[in-house]
Swiss-Prot record:
Coiled-coil ranges (or none): none
Domain of life of the source: Eukaryota
Organism: Sinapis alba
Propeptide: 94-99
Cell compartment(s), UniProt: Secreted
SUPFAM superfamilies xrefs: Scorpion toxin-like
Site (Reactive bond): R50, I51
Functional note: Inhibits bovine beta-trypsin and alpha-chymotrypsin on a 1:1 molar basis.
Claim: Iron is one of the keywords in the record: no
Designated name of the protein: Defensin-like protein 2
Disulfide pattern: C34-C86, C47-C71, C56-C81, C60-C83
């Protein structure tokens, strides 16, 4: 009888662990993994023209294989073009602050 209880307990424990492992949702990538700087001093020319989508967005897609691009504005003309490898939304492109 004791052996049967031990087998059932072991089976139950293994079954629960398998369920937990397969039901854990995938962890989404952090911004640091998604956003990479385009490179060079291209921020202001890529982000300043008031066109839609920005040159940053278009060039990141064409030249870097990213899903899109975002502009991060600092003080004055301090701008960075970041290629976004996780999100392809052209509507969320311009971020203020954070440089």
């Amino acid at each position: 009888m004791a052996m049967a209880k031990k087998s059932v307990s072991s089976f139950t424990l293994i079954f629960i662990l398998v369920l937990v492992i397969f039901e854990v949702p995938e962890i989404k990538a952090q911004d640091s993994e998604c956003l990479k700087e385009y490179g060079g001093d291209v921020g202001f020319p890529f982000c300043a023209p008031r066109i839609f989508p920005t040159i940053c967005y278009t060039r990141c897609r064409e030249n870097k294989g990213a899903k899109g691009g975002r502009c991060i504005w600092g003080e004055g003309t301090n701008v960075k073009c970041l290629c976004d490898y996780c999100n392809d939304s052209p509507f969320d492109q311009i971020l203020r602050g954070g440089i």
